[in-house]
From Swiss-Prot:
This is Probable Fe(2+)-trafficking protein. One of its GO terms (cellular component) is cytosol. Keywords: Iron. It comes from Cupriavidus taiwanensis (strain DSM 17343 / BCRC 17206 / CCUG 44338 / CIP 107171 / LMG 19424 / R1). The keyword Repeat does not apply. GO terms for biological process: cellular response to oxidative stress. GO terms for molecular function: iron ion binding. NCBIfam families: PRK05408.1. Belongs to the Fe(2+)-trafficking protein family. It comes from the Bacteria.
């Protein structure tokens, strides 16, 4: 049976992650209160930030930036938006 959590991002009960996605306290906090659906949304947003800002993931500063953005995305005022990004029109 799938584990359910009250997702802090989607504000609803949803299937939880199978394991903490990051090491340390932030990973544990995400595992306890973020759904698979919300995590998938973060991965898309993270990819956009990496690509649009041309982040080099071998650079420790880029990794620290993404960790801060992860925390802001789920538990703060929201992550940064990529400069010049325009969402597709439906």
């Amino acid at each position: 049976m799938a584990r359910t959590v009250h997702c802090i991002k989607l504000n609803k009960e949803a299937e939880g992650l199978d394991f903490p996605p990051l090491p340390g306290e932030l990973g544990k906090k995400i595992w306890q209160s973020v759904s698979k659906e919300a995590w998938a949304g973060w991965l898309k947003h993270q990819t956009m930030l990496i690509n649009e800002n041309r982040l080099n993931m071998a650079d420790a500063r880029a990794r620290q930036y993404l960790l801060k953005q992860t925390e802001k995305y789920f538990f703060g005022e929201g992550a940064d938006q990529a400069q010049g990004y325009v969402p597709p029109q439906s």
